[in-house]
Regions:
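Cleavable N-terminal export/targeting peptides
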Residues: 1-24
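Glycine- and aromatic-enriched membrane insertion/assembly motifs of diderm outer-membrane
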Residues: 22-95, 148-150, 154, 160
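Mid-chain, well-packed structural core segment of small domains
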Residues: 92-120, 125-130
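Outer-membrane beta-barrel "beta-signal"
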Residues: 157-167
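Catalytic phosphate/metal-binding cores of nucleic-acid and nucleotide-processing enzymes, i.e., regions
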Residues: 135-137, 141, 145
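Mature soluble domains of exported/periplasmic/lumenal proteins and thiol-rich metal-chelating peptides
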Residues: 111-115, 138, 152
Length: 167
């Protein structure tokens, strides 16, 4: 699983920017409202020019982190998840008659997760790796030509709000 995600990242950071449409790319930050907060950063590159029939597709590469502290009588435990992934995002704005600033979308990709549990001093931390499908659907609202608000539902972070900076 790690090899697939590494290949996806290499593809996204080398090949995708070469075919990305200027002015339709973005970087952003997000905050998942589930699990007491999931922080994330992402980059998204429009590849519609290289798609058959110019389909409105972009590639999203992201990192998300969730961390929680649990105090106990024996000490404090900290649990954290790091998720790295890539997804193909389809823009449905041309399929619906909406305000041009509203952009509904859905996406599917892969995510690799690393979880770590550390305990009181003297106990070694434990960690595990996993991964799987990443599913996302949401809507973006262009507040200005350079900034968009994002609201989505995904399977890592749940209901998520964010800000995207277009370039």
């Amino acid at each position: 699983m790690k090899k697939i995600v590494i290949v996806a990242f290499l593809f996204a950071f080398t090949a995708v920017p070469a075919v990305a449409a200027e002015g339709k790319n973005n970087v952003g930050v997000s905050y998942g409202l589930d699990l007491d907060g999931v922080l994330g950063v992402q980059g998204e590159f429009d590849i519609s020019a290289s798609m058959p029939n110019k389909a409105p597709v972009s590639i999203q590469v992201f990192w998300k982190n969730y961390s929680q502290t649990y105090p106990t009588g024996a000490g404090t435990y900290q649990w954290s998840y790091n998720g790295f992934g890539a997804a193909a995002i389809y823009d449905f704005s041309s399929s619906f008659k909406l305000d041009s600033r509203i952009k509904p979308y859905a996406g599917l990709g892969l995510i690799a997760l690393n979880s770590t549990l550390s305990g009181p001093a003297g106990q070694p931390p434990t960690s595990a790796d996993s991964g799987g499908l990443y599913i996302v659907g949401g809507v973006r609202y262009a507040m200005t030509p350079a900034v968009s608000a994002d609201l989505n539902l995904n399977n890592y972070g749940g209901l998520t709000i964010g800000a995207l900076f277009n370039f």
